[in-house]
Curated annotation (Swiss-Prot):
GO terms for molecular function: structural constituent of ribosome. Keywords: Ribonucleoprotein, Ribosomal protein. It holds the Pfam family Ribosomal_L27. The gene is rpmA. PANTHER family: LARGE RIBOSOMAL SUBUNIT PROTEIN BL27M (PTHR15893:SF0), RIBOSOMAL PROTEIN L27 (PTHR15893). This is Large ribosomal subunit protein bL27. PROSITE patterns: RIBOSOMAL_L27. Belongs to the bacterial ribosomal protein bL27 family. Coiled coil: none annotated.
């Protein structure tokens, strides 16, 4: 007959790695083509003029210029543009 009690396993003890999401360059800042403006999950911000949308919804500059944020349309969508330098 065993004299040790059965030991239960903990349901905790794991954590995901940080994803470093968020706005990387703010309005009025200079940017070069290819630089990341925002890393996001889903389209919290939408791509405007001079901005590309990556596979993981990352927004990046297509041209050199200045970052500009705006709110457009009846749905009040937050849009990011790059004004060419």
């Amino acid at each position: 007959m065993a004299h040790k009690k059965g030991v239960g396993s903990s349901r905790n003890g794991r954590d995901s790695n940080p994803k470093y999401l968020g706005v990387k360059l703010f309005g009025g800042q200079a940017i070069e083509a290819g630089n990341i403006i925002i890393r996001q999950r889903g389209t919290q911000f939408h791509a405007g003029d001079g901005v590309g949308l990556g596979r993981d919804h990352t927004l990046f500059a297509l041209v050199n210029g200045t970052v500009e944020f705006s709110i457009k349309g009846p749905k009040k969508r937050r849009t990011v543009n790059v004004i060419p330098a």
